[in-house]
């Protein structure tokens, strides 16, 4: 099995891995009106790392103070949707599942590290070394150009 460091394992275990629970909660809230919660968090431009320089320019902060939006801003749908996304029933359900460690799977966490953990040798139709050994002459001598590998040939 692939080795994972404790820090990396802890970080990846904290990530939401249970897609079934997220899908079920999102489907249930998708039928309700008004749409207050979704699995995708609402976008807040003032908290976006890539838009930080725009909001720190010399023109924008006075405008934000004038419109009373200089306290971190809200998402497109307003503060109620932001509040319900953080403290609503759907998010509380997902938070409780993740705090308890539900939905954590070692195969999902190890990801690509787990892919080559237990390889078995593959012997194809032409043997261990592939197509270069499929004629009697090549089975007797390796190549007229010499060997280019340090692995055993026969």
Swiss-Prot record:
Pfam families from the UniProt entry: SPMAP1-like
Cystine pairs annotated here are none
Which top-rank group of organisms is this from? Eukaryota
Q: Which InterPro entries match?
A: SPMAP1
Q: PANTHER family per the record?
A: HYPOTHETICAL PROTEIN LOC691189, RIKEN CDNA 1700001P01 GENE
Q: What is this protein called?
A: Sperm microtubule associated protein 1
- Origin species: Homo sapiens (Human)
Gene that specifies this protein? SPMAP1
């Amino acid at each position: 099995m692939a080795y994972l460091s404790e820090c990396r394992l802890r970080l990846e275990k904290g990530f939401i891995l249970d897609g079934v629970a997220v899908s079920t909660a999102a489907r249930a809230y998708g039928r309700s009106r008004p749409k207050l919660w979704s699995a995708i968090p609402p976008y807040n431009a003032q908290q976006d790392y890539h838009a930080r320089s725009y909001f720190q320019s010399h023109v924008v902060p006075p405008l934000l103070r004038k419109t009373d939006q200089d306290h971190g801003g809200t998402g497109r749908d307003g503060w109620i949707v932001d509040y319900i996304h953080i403290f609503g029933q759907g998010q509380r359900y997902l938070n409780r599942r993740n705090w308890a460690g539900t939905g954590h799977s070692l195969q999902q966490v190890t990801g690509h590290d787990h892919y080559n953990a237990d390889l078995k040798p593959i012997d194809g139709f032409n043997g261990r070394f592939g197509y270069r050994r499929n004629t009697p002459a090549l089975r007797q001598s390796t190549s007229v150009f010499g060997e280019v590998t340090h692995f055993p040939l026969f």
